[in-house]
Regions:
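Alpha-helical transmembrane segments and their immediate juxtamembrane cytosolic regions
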Residues: 1-369
């Protein structure tokens, strides 16, 4: 099951343009594109049933179910796993396995601390710090997936993923909530939410539990490992056509498996259920196949340039957006215009963001962690 060294993979281009573009596409939604789309649809199609359907897709599900916007976060973690599969063998070759492992842990620590900072950790008391959040989950999941990929071959990674997903599901079926005796998936009354309320210090996003909580980080690691597996496939598939076919087929199989599991272990983003992992990873693979085919195989890439700008500095832009810098600039622009600010502000905000990302790219400023 274990491999003595990282698999030696065939040489590929140092950057896969579609991977950078899809990362930028994904981050663009996080940074405000969904708000801009909602504003435009509300403004120009207020009574359209189609517009209402689209608006619903740009919101998270309250609990069980799946929307397009529920894909955005796990897609980023999936792509982080792919990046590990591509970058780690090169780092091991240059610096050795121990140095690569130390780098993974250092990066995870930096992301964790940045996540605390993002949630106003420097201005609040210890009891008001949100210790778990988006950046913390990205750091932990990607580091864990990277460390696993240093130690395990592909078969070992598959077994580990299954163990994480099945083990997490078993907790909900076998371990009752001590305070209520409940087994299951009710919001606020399940084992994952209970562990958050009893173990995680500081401020929880939902007061008594957190959508980026402690137990639900385990299946998030599986999301990243599935990305590692996809990355290894890209490296070893042999031809662009086979790469695309494998991503499409594997993605659709995962989507089907996730929804087949849904009646027994529902698709719920806020506790990162195992069925949710499969559905999200499946659609992530399908999206990557489409981007890879269009950009890297067919060479139709000019349309993706704005996404490449964002994908080159995703974490830096995320932190700046969290400081409301782009929104404040958008509000100032909208305030000086004669149009209603309710829908103009989100448009101005994403425009400022794009212009700043373009400037960073033109100046070759790439902030890596």
């Amino acid at each position: 099951m274990t491999a003595p060294s990282v698999p030696q993979l065939p040489a590929k281009p140092s950057r896969i343009a579609s991977l950078d573009a899809l990362r930028g596409f994904d981050m663009f939604w996080i940074l405000g594109l969904h708000e801009a789309m909602n504003a435009l649809l509300h403004k120009f199609f207020p009574d359209s049933s189609c517009a209402k359907m689209l608006i619903a897709q740009f919101q998270h599900k309250d609990w069980a179910g799946f929307t397009f916007y529920d894909l955005i976060f796990p897609l980023f973690i999936f792509l982080a796993g792919i990046s590990q599969a591509i970058a780690l063998p090169r780092r091991v070759e240059r610096e050795g396995k121990s140095a690569a492992a130390i780098h993974l842990l250092q990066r995870a620590l930096i992301l964790f601390l940045l996540g605390v900072f993002y949630n106003n950790g420097l201005t609040n008391g210890w009891d008001q710090i949100r210790w778990l959040g988006v950046l913390q989950r990205i750091g932990i999941a990607s580091a864990a997936a990277g460390l696993l990929s240093l130690c395990l071959n592909t078969r070992g990674l598959i077994i580990t993923t299954l163990a994480l997903l099945i083990g997490y599901a078993a907790l909900f079926y076998l371990v009752p909530v001590p305070t209520s005796g409940a087994r299951g998936f009710e919001m606020g009354n399940n084992i994952a939410n209970y562990v958050d309320s009893m173990v995680v210090p500081g401020r929880l996003h939902q007061k008594t539990w957190d959508p980026e909580g402690l137990l639900s980080t385990l299946p998030a690691i599986a999301s990243a490992v599935l990305g590692v597996l996809a990355g290894r496939w890209i490296q070893t598939s042999g031809s662009p056509e086979r790469t695309v076919l494998g991503l499409l087929t594997g993605g659709l199989v995962l989507v089907f498996a996730g929804w087949a599991w849904h009646p027994f272990f529902p698709v719920i983003k806020k506790i990162w259920t195992s069925s949710y992992v499969l559905v999200a990873a499946g659609w992530s693979a399908v999206l990557l196949a489409l981007f890879y085919w269009v950009i890297d195989v067919k060479g139709w890439s000019s349309w993706s340039t704005p996404f490449l700008w964002i994908g080159a500095n995703p974490i830096a832009l995320y932190l700046l957006a969290g400081m409301q810098l782009f929104q404040k600039a958008g509000e100032r622009i909208a305030g000086k215009a004669s149009l209603p600010t309710g829908w103009l502000t989100p448009i101005a905000t994403v425009t400022v963001l794009l212009l700043f990302a373009r400037w960073l790219s033109r100046e070759k400023i790439f902030i890596r962690i």
